[in-house]
Amino acid sequence: MTVEKESRCAVLGYGSWATAIVKTLTVNHQHVNWLVLNDDILKSLEERSHNVKYLPWCYIDRDYITPSKDINEVVRDVDIVFLAMPSAFLTKFLEPLKESLADKIVVSAVKGIIPGDYLTIVEHMNRYYNVPMKNLAVMTGPSHAEEVGQCRLSYLTVASEDNASAERVKELLNNDFFRCSISNDVLGVEAAAIMKNVYALAVGIAVGLRYGDNFLAVLISGCANEMNNFLNASVPIGNRNINAAAYMGDLLVTCYSPLSRNRRLGTLLGKGCSVKSALNEMTMVAEGYYAAECIRRSSMHTGVDMPIADMVWEVLYNNASARDAMLALTKILK
């Protein structure tokens, strides 16, 4: 039986992933201050204990949530803050913030990059909100919101430079269906979470072009090698296991699952949609669109050869034909 935790926490964001995180916390009898900026969602939570727009079938125990549109009210008296909005909206979410976050544990569940800033969420919060690295954590791993919201078994990694911070977050989340481990590879798991979205776009493009499973296996193997080479060059540590869930597991589920929004975007591109029309077709943000530009810049800086990520960038930002770009890639994959 789950015991009630002493820490009070906040979740900033009201999409599918934020809703799944709130579900997990409330199942653990953890009270959550929840930043919800949408009036329809606020009303549905208060009246029916459901988020009417995202995971509308997911019941949220009303006794354990305090929804509010006031970010300062939401974070004021909490110990731990979860960031769970698309990366493109993070600065807008935090714009009204006057309360300091420096003495709180701030957990990024974003899996994205700040567009135009080219900083990871951890780097952004450290630089602009003065949250010390010891108070910053990343929560990542193979974790579709739809499955977490259904309480289906998932394995997540909480990474922080400070083991005590990681353990506190782990204790809040851990239960029978949400299993957490800890890591100190903060920048590595955060980079992997960003990169796998780009690679899911590549796989989606191949699916849209009607390449078969044999080729997809080779493509994803190439993605794993490319990611490993990039991590070793840009965030080198001695004990990283690229086959762990935070790296390989997240890559595989994002590339293979029909629930993956990045794969879905890639599939539209592979079927011949323009970038603009494919983005307009998406009902949720595909983080890989923003991440591709960042990975391109980083690979040029580190000198790592990344032909798969480069192919995605060419299609998204250089008006390359998805068919021609993928055909060129097939000639160098092994």
Model region roles, listed by residue range:
Residues F89, S100, R127-N135, L153-R240:
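Internal alpha-helical scaffold of NAD(P)-dependent oxidoreductase catalytic cores
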Residues R62, P67-R76, I80-L153, V169-E171:
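Rossmann-like NAD(P)(H) cofactor-binding subdomain of soluble oxidoreductases
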Residues V203-V207, N232-K334:
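NAD(P)-dependent Rossmann-like dehydrogenase/reductase catalytic/cofactor-binding core
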Residues M1-C58, Y64-K69:
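NAD(P)+-binding Rossmann beta1-loop-alpha1 motif at the extreme N-terminus of oxidoreductases
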